[in-house]
Amino acid sequence: MYNRYVLSRRRTGFGDCLWSLAAAWRYAQRTARTLAVDWRGSCYLDQPFTNAFPVFFEPIKDIAGVPFICDNRVNEFSFPGPFFPNWWNKPAIECVYRPDAQVFRERDELDELFQAQDDVEANTVVCDACLMWRCDEEAERQIFCSVKPRAEIQARIDAIYQEHFYGYSAIGVHVRHGNGEDVMDHAPYWADPDLAVHQVCTAINAAKALPHPKPVRVILCTDSARVLDQVSSRFPDLLTIPKSFRADQSGPLHSADLGVEGGISALVEMYLLGLCDTVIRFPPTSAFTRYARLSVPRVIEFDLNDPSRLVVIERSSTNTAS
């Protein structure tokens, strides 16, 4: 095992966690370091000192030759200094509270480091920020190829696919609402909530009108019971996976309030979307559908600069439709 490390720390949704892990893995591979994942304090668990990775994913020893620490050894492991970014060289007690400005500063420092294709003298590089868009797609594919849901979760995914998807051309619809949280980059898509739902329904109709080799089945995955009611009222034959929702406008679905089952439900939907023939991403800024974006033959997105404009992305070409 290498004696220098990249530590990937996240407490957010699985899309962000895995995408950020891909960026950390690429740097670890390039600089001959061991990669460690620390998902303690995960939004999916009410146990702050439990590493969420082994709760939801199968144990692995390496990712394409990069040694990988992914269990609760991170609780006792003493990562060697010096550290990068420099913030982590402070006494541990002073690192407990990190203001948002510091997190964004570290994200930018890591971005510069990754883009420069250089290494640093630090023995441990700490990646504790959202690192979406900070690596190439092949790094993302490597993570999704290597990191597998636990066997019992995969069995649930397979069973649902066989019962509801097999023999159909599946259209997966992901609608990230936020349910009252600060949705940040997603906000422009929800400036007019009624229009947003109308746009989603328009996209579903557009997807159904495209050529399909088999009978079409539409599945909706959303974090909002309100959105579920609105969309299913217009498409009565819509398929949904039973799960618990939080009260209206009470915050994001990825919450410790729902326990481990909430995380399992999220993984089931994320991987089922990746098995669809067509996926609609609303908004396309959500990392939850990144796996589907990389694996599904046809993706329908909403233009970042003009959310009313649909973009149809095929594996070999890109077309637009208004």
Swiss-Prot record:
What are the alphabetically sorted keywords of the record? Glycosyltransferase, Nodulation, Plasmid, Transferase
Show where the GT23 domain sits. 1-314
This enzyme's EC code(s):
2.4.1.-
> Which PROSITE patterns is this protein grouped with?
GT23 (PS51659)
Q: Name one GO biological process term.
A: oligosaccharide biosynthetic process
Q: Name one GO molecular function term.
A: hexosyltransferase activity
Q: Does the keyword Translocase apply?
A: no
InterPro entries registered for this protein in UniProt: GT23_dom, NodZ
Q: Which family does it belong to?
A: Belongs to the glycosyltransferase 23 family.
**Function (record text):** Fucosyltransferase which adds the fucose moiety of the nod factor on its terminal reducing N-acetylglucosamine end. Uses GDP-fucose as the donor group.
UniProt-recorded name of the protein: Nodulation protein Z
- State the organism of origin: Sinorhizobium fredii (strain NBRC 101917 / NGR234)
Query: What is the gene name?
Result: nodZ
